[in-house]
Regions:
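Type-3 copper protein
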Residues: 1-154
Length: 154
């Protein structure tokens, strides 16, 4: 869990608190080249650049479950960190592991926030029509699941 200094942390600040091993795992997941020769500062810059790509965020948000997407969207659009209703759930953990969300323990419970650079990437996606694309993708997914359940019952 990260300490929340302000309502929306800086992505580089979040990444600098990660270990070199975790940064290397993230960089491999984001297809960053030449990480074996990079020091921590270079890894932070490379992973930050990879995370700021709107297409990468779009790919992830299209395939996450509806509850996780709703949590991300609420946290992204909220001016303040939002409280996680069920801290035992897995909704926030995937996005926290990928550094798209920042979690913090507060006296009121677990809160999540979206780093400013990720918020900017999500805003760009929304301006480019991502919300309509997400709605169509979810509709197709629901039709496919309904067909699977229908044919499974026959």
């Amino acid at each position: 869990m990260e300490l929340m200094i302000n309502s929306h942390p800086d992505l580089e600040g979040v990444l600098t608190r990660r270990t070199a091993a975790k940064l290397k795992v993230l960089s491999k997941g984001y297809y960053v080249k030449g990480t074996s020769q990079m020091n921590n500062a270079a890894l932070v810059c490379a992973v930050t650049d990879a995370l700021k790509e709107p297409d990468r965020l779009s790919e992830l948000l299209l395939v996450v479950d509806p509850q996780t997407y709703t949590l991300f969207r609420r946290a992204s659009e909220s001016p303040d960190p939002i409280k996680v209703k069920d801290p035992g759930s897995e909704q926030y953990r995937l996005l926290d592991d990928f550094c798209y969300l920042v979690c913090a323990d507060t006296p009121d419970g677990l809160v999540v926030s979206v780093p400013t650079q990720i918020r900017a990437a999500f805003e760009q996606l929304k301006n480019d029509g991502f919300l309509k694309q997400k709605d169509r993708f979810d509709l197709l997914h629901n039709y496919a699941m309904a067909a699977i359940h229908l044919y499974g019952a026959i």
